[in-house]
Amino acid sequence: MDRVLVAMSGGVDSSVTAALLKEQGYEVIGGTMEIFPDYEQPPLDEGGCCSLSSIEDARRVAHHIGIRHYTFNLKKVFEEEVINNFVNEYKNARTPNPCVVCNNEIKFRSLLKKALELDADYIATGHYAIVEHNVNGKHLLKKAKDVDKDQTYMLYGLTQFQLSHTLMPLGNYTKQEVRQMAKDFGFRIHNKPESQEICFVPDNNYTRFLDENYPGLGKPGPVMDTDGNILGKHKGLHHYTIGQRRGLGISLGYPVYVVKLDREKNAVIIGPEEEVYSKSLIANKVNWISIDKLTEPIKVTARIRYNSPESHAKIYPVNDNEVKVVFDKKQRAVTPGQSVVFYDGKVVVGGGIIKENF
């Protein structure tokens, strides 16, 4: 009997994952991560995956379905890998995606290590995605049945080794079906609301988190147009992101948007909306899933943020770590620090971190 460690957050998806795998004959162990930094008070309510009540919810579900449950203290590695990266990206005038880093470094590295230490064959999560093992020698990541819930954008960084030890049973179900299963399993959390915020910033106010915990991260500087004319003053680059319109404090008689964050000049560059669009980007820290490496240009569809639609593009190799992406049509607010993920139909080809746009 294969043993699987299920990453249980206390939410509907991971709870149903554990119950489904037990029904399918796996020896299931539940594991919940403690990752909330000590300097931020963890919420008591049911809001986020890190709340104290969520750990209790996970324990209750594990007891309800009759499986062992462990709590793993991953605060140190979470701070080192996720929070420090989050802070450094803002420090370098980029807009990070901490969920991508968390999946790569915490769930599918640190937690997988715990799973292997427990002699588990697999780790399982409640992600809406499909993992297909040993397809022509590859472990593939594919889009979920529920296109509105598909989470492959957050998972493009998984390696072949990680995928070979990963199960994602919810990929073939809709969210509505999963909630019904939670109800059928008798879980009291079947109507629990989904967490929308960054888990370590439960009020979703990331500038408050940065200003309170990392004072001096950003310094005031000029707001400039694309010709270099100074139009005003900003309160720190981490308060802004590409495409932002609100909160600029600039009135030019027409709508203006953040076009670029210039770290060298500590300047926020603004312009009319057409200047927010770009046709190309360079991405680095590239990871490939369905191919070994990119040796020649290929056509793909690409997604530049979690909730954006895919767009047709061609990707060109720059070196082993970088690619150039040229879109068929200009894209709005291509944001350094965010991820770009490449698809061939339902299959994830790979992805990387946006370095620059042009």
From Swiss-Prot:
SUPFAM superfamilies membership: Adenine nucleotide alpha hydrolases-like (SSF52402)
Task: From the record, give the cysteines joined by S-S bonds.
Answer: C102-C199
Q: Which GO terms describe its cellular component?
A: cytoplasm
Q: Which UniProt keywords apply?
A: ATP-binding, Cytoplasm, Disulfide bond, Nucleotide-binding, RNA-binding, Transferase, tRNA processing, tRNA-binding
A single GO molecular function term of this UniProt record: tRNA binding
InterPro entries associated with the record = MnmA-like, MnmA-like_C, MnmA-like_central, MnmA-like_central_sf, Rossmann-like_a/b/a_fold
- Write out the catalytic residues in the record: C102, C199
GO terms in the biological process aspect are: tRNA wobble position uridine thiolation
Give the catalysed reaction(s), semicolon-separated.
Answer: S-sulfanyl-L-cysteinyl-[protein] + uridine(34) in tRNA + AH2 + ATP = 2-thiouridine(34) in tRNA + L-cysteinyl-[protein] + A + AMP + diphosphate + H(+)
Principal location: cytoplasm
Is Lipid metabolism tagged as a keyword?
no
Q: Where does ATP bind?
A: A7, M8, S9, G10, G11, V12, D13, S14, M33, G126
Compartments, as annotated in UniProt: Cytoplasm
Give the protein's biological function.
Catalyzes the 2-thiolation of uridine at the wobble position (U34) of tRNA, leading to the formation of s(2)U34.
Q: Which PANTHER family match?
A: MITOCHONDRIAL TRNA-SPECIFIC 2-THIOURIDYLASE 1 (PTHR11933:SF5), TRNA 5-METHYLAMINOMETHYL-2-THIOURIDYLATE -METHYLTRANSFERASE (PTHR11933)
Its name, as the record gives it, is: tRNA-specific 2-thiouridylase MnmA
What organism, scientifically named, is this protein from? Halothermothrix orenii (strain H 168 / OCM 544 / DSM 9562)
Q: Which gene encodes it?
A: mnmA
